[in-house]
Regions:
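Predominantly single-stranded RNA-binding modules in RNA-associated proteins
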Residues: 6-8, 63
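Long, charged, low-complexity intrinsically disordered regions
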Residues: 1-6, 49
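C-terminal edge-of-domain segments
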Residues: 53-73
Length: 73
């Protein structure tokens, strides 16, 4: 059986703060093939290949709108 590690975090931020976090992540991805995440005193390093699949999903309707950005490989 494969071990699954997952971080699922939801925070309410100002739009500018969310953009800054996305920008920081984009900068790290542009410079390195690794991204580090910290959670509950632990740290995980994700190795990202040179080519990835980018999925952008928009859901409109109802009370909640959604823009989802996903990288897979």
């Amino acid at each position: 059986m494969d071990n699954l590690f997952e971080i699922d975090e939801t925070k309410r931020l100002r739009r500018e703060e969310a953009a800054a976090r996305l920008r920081d992540l984009a900068d790290v991805l542009a410079r390195n093939n690794e991204v580090e995440f910290e959670r509950d005193g632990g740290r995980i390093t994700v190795h990202v290949p040179d080519e990835v699949n980018l999925k952008i999903e928009v859901e409109l309707g109802g009370d909640e709108q959604e823009l989802e950005i996903e990288l897979t490989w």
